[in-house]
Structure formats: structure tokens, C-alpha cells
Regions:
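Structural motif
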Residues: 13-14, 38-40, 69-70, 101-104
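Buried hydrophobic positions in well-ordered alpha/beta secondary-structure cores of metabolic enzymes
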Residues: 23, 71, 121-124
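Internal helical hairpin/lid segments
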Residues: 30-83, 87
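Conserved anion/nucleotide-ligand pocket segment
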Residues: 1-22
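Glycine-rich, charged/polar anion/phosphate-binding loops
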Residues: 9-10, 22-28, 55-58
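Solvent-exposed alpha-helices and their adjacent loops that cap or buttress functional pockets
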Residues: 7-8, 15, 32-34, 64-65, ...
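ATP/nucleoside-binding phosphotransfer catalytic cores, i.e., glycine-rich phosphate-binding loops
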Residues: 78-136
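Glycine-/acidic-rich phosphate or pyrophosphate-binding loops and their flanking alpha/beta elements
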Residues: 1-3, 27-33
Length: 136
């Protein structure tokens, strides 16, 4: 997949995550994985700004954004199709509040018929060249 870099230059770690809402169902259970040193992948089919803000704040309250090595934002179908403001990238940056956390955005991962696959649990390294907004 081709990511667009929002902030940071490199991320490396095991991929965890998936649908922003469904993955939160694991909170408080033995099935929620450790986030330490991981790359968190989040995407969503439905949900407006208020729902996304609620989900993102729950991840923040769980301490996730202080533990991960990077964040991949996939396609947020309803948010993007309806042109909600703030957009998902702005909302994430506002709620995460950590300018040192590497974040990328890609529409290649999500619920579309042409979506690409990311293997959960696989080690992933993403990086970019200086001044290049894309993967290097």
C-alpha cells in the first residue's frame, strides 16, 4: 500500500488493530493485545465525527498512543464520502496530541472492494525520504 505521511519519518513494529470500533470491543478483556512498540492500524466503514472522536479518546484513555511506534489510518468511508469536518487526519492529530508519533494515511486499506490486505501480527517497516510525502 502507498501511505501518505502525516507526521514522522519512520515506523517499525508488529501490526495490531483493524476496524476502529470493533477493535475497542477487546478493551477490558484478556484478548486486547499489548500495544508496546506496535503499529496500530485503524479504519472504519461508518461513523461521523462525534463517533470517531469518542473512539479515539477511548484509545487515548487506554494509553495506546503513548505505547505505539506508529499509526496507520486506513479508509474512513463515511467520514471521507460525506466530507465531514474536521477530517479524520485533523481529528486524530488533535486527539492524539503527540507530534512525535509517526502517522500515515492510506485509502488502500479499508472496506472497499479493491482494498489491500495488511497481515495483523506481521512486522512492518515504513519510512520516507526527506521531503517526500510518500513511502521511501
Amino acid at each position: 500500500f502507498q501511505p501518505t505521511w502525516i507526521q514522522g519519518k519512520k515506523m517499525k513494529g508488529e501490526v495490531v488493530g483493524g476496524n476502529i470500533r470493533c477493535f475497542l470491543k477487546l478493551a477490558g478483556t484478556e484478548y486486547l493485545p499489548s500495544f508496546d512498540g506496535k503499529i496500530l492500524l485503524l479504519e472504519s466503514y461508518s461513523g461521523d465525527v462525534a463517533k470517531m472522536a469518542t473512539y479515539l479518546n477511548q484509545y487515548k484513555q487506554l494509553g495506546v498512543f503513548d505505547q505505539i511506534n506508529g499509526l496507520i489510518l486506513g479508509h474512513f468511508t463515511e467520514m471521507q464520502q460525506k466530507g465531514y469536518e474536521p477530517d479524520i487526519v485533523s481529528l486524530v492529530q488533535e486527539i492524539v496530541g503527540n507530534q512525535d508519533l509517526p502517522i500515515v494515511k492510506t485509502d488502500d486499506i479499508g472496506h472497499g472492494p479493491d482494498s489491500k490486505c495488511v497481515i495483523i501480527g506481521e512486522l512492518l517497516t515504513l519510512g520516507r525520504e526527506e521531503g517526500n510525502g510518500n513511502e521511501g
